[in-house]
């Protein structure tokens, strides 16, 4: 089956790559908690209108932190289910399960590979 939208594409420009090379080639490189990363977090936070943001090493880590925060916010709530698509990565589901939530699977929409809205509404 040929899909209308590709799952991935390269959207990095030469300028982006030059900046990454400059950062990685720095003699005192610290990838996750450096001055540059802190500056970027502050600029990012201002740009999206929030007080704080935290950058992590991967989407898997980001998902885990998000679910951990949701667990804290959801502490006294009865519902502990998270709706997730059937087309996903194992790390997405692991972040749900590792934080004590129950994944509720929903079929995808084959035209754009997102969760099927009608199926999501049925699960709520």
What are these regions (language model features)?
Residues 7-10, 52, 110:
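Short, flexible active-site loop motifs that bind/organize anionic cofactors or intermediates
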């Amino acid at each position: 089956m040929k899909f209308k939208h590709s799952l991935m594409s390269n959207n990095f420009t030469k300028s982006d790559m030059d900046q990454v090379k400059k950062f990685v080639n720095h003699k005192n490189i610290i990838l996750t908690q450096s001055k540059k990363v802190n500056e970027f977090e502050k600029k990012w936070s201002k740009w999206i209108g929030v007080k704080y943001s935290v950058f992590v090493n991967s989407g898997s880590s980001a998902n885990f932190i998000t679910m951990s925060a949701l667990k804290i916010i959801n502490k006294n709530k009865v519902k502990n289910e998270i709706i997730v698509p059937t087309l996903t990565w194992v790390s997405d589901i692991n972040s749900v399960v590792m934080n004590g939530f129950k994944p509720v699977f929903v079929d995808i929409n084959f035209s754009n590979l997102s969760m099927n809205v009608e199926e999501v509404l049925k699960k709520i």
